Amino acid sequence: MTNLTIALDAMGGDFGPRITVPACLRALASNPHLKILLVGQPDSISPLLANQNAELISRLHVIPAEHIVANDAKPSHAIRASKGTSMRVALDLVKTGEAQACVSAGNTGVLMGLAKLRLKAIDGIERPALVSVLPNQKKSKTVVLDLGANVNCDSQMLVQFAVMGAVMAEEIAGIHSPKVALLNIGEEESKGLDNIREAATVLKATPNINYIGYVEGNELLTGKTDVLVCDGFAGNVSLKTMEGVIRVFLSLIKSSTGDNKKTSWWMKLLKKWLQKRLNKRFGHMNPDQYNGASLLGLRGIVIKSHGGANENAFTAAIEQAVQAIERQIPERIASRLNTVLPKSD
């Protein structure tokens, strides 16, 4: 297998190197052909690499970057002042071909802006979108976009997202003729904002898109649609609400055995059995397992991790980058877009 190289913004996210460095080591252990360029402040990174496996360390190289993009930074200002930041250095490593993908848990708006400036968008795409492939009730996958890269979207952008999402579902999730829907407050054609209704009109008339209409938020995980399209505001709120509910549910399962000394032995045994069955049935819904959203529509691979990701979740984001490299996502998406999406003037 060909060697893979990922540039990683070690300083991004709520916890920085405390999470990113251990996650890197785990990803290296799982992928013997992987090399990671760890971008950030050496003084913060090096102590976390002490006494680690020598073979893993040989495939991990620290690239100095003294500055950090603050989580609360205003994108316009942070982009202008981005030179020397770990986020920009990591993206530039992809631009120059020294790395094949970039992973960051940093400021979403800044990452979006910098990625578009440094890597450029695929021809015909107005703005890249954050997309994630989520598990659904039918034990299949649902591609959801945009998840926060573009708060306001006109109808043309929603149409482009629909096309990209359909390509993603077909090429990556292996779904033939994927069903595409727009997120809305009802299924009736008259409902929704103007941009949503205008996008629906265009999608209905697009022969290469299997458009099925509107889907409400309560059907996000039912598998009713293979691709769910929305603006970044609605998508981000929907995703985080869904993840919060799932985490509460899984925590209730985890605590179901309890430590009550008055509980009979057979009741404790029953609870443990039930917990095991529920974990087996619903464990795949754990948000940590699908952390990482791809900035779809760029000429390079960029994976955005949740800022508050733990070690397991950040490792999942790195693994997603590995898969994206192996499957040559930008090239395959660009190839399909040439036949599906009309090029803009």
Curated annotation (Swiss-Prot):
Pathway(s) of this molecule: Lipid metabolism; phospholipid metabolism
Subcellular location: Cytoplasm
GO biological process: fatty acid biosynthetic process; phospholipid biosynthetic process
Subcellular location, principal: cytoplasm
Pfam families: FA_synthesis
InterPro entries assigned to the protein according to its UniProt record, in alphabetical order: FA_synthesis, Phospholipid_synth_PlsX-like
Catalytic activity: a fatty acyl-[ACP] + phosphate = an acyl phosphate + holo-[ACP]
Recorded GO MF terms: phosphate:acyl-[acyl carrier protein] acyltransferase activity
Keyword Cell membrane: no
Signal sequence region: none
GO cellular component assignments: cytoplasm
Domain of life, per lineage: Bacteria
Keywords, comma-separated and alphabetical: Cytoplasm, Lipid biosynthesis, Lipid metabolism, Phospholipid biosynthesis, Phospholipid metabolism, Transferase
EC number: 2.3.1.274
Subunit structure: Homodimer. Probably interacts with PlsY.
NCBIfam families associated with the record: plsX (TIGR00182)
Biological function: Catalyzes the reversible formation of acyl-phosphate (acyl-PO(4)) from acyl-[acyl-carrier-protein] (acyl-ACP). This enzyme utilizes acyl-ACP as fatty acyl donor, but not acyl-CoA.
Family, similarity comment: Belongs to the PlsX family.
Protein name: Phosphate acyltransferase
Organism: Proteus mirabilis (strain HI4320)
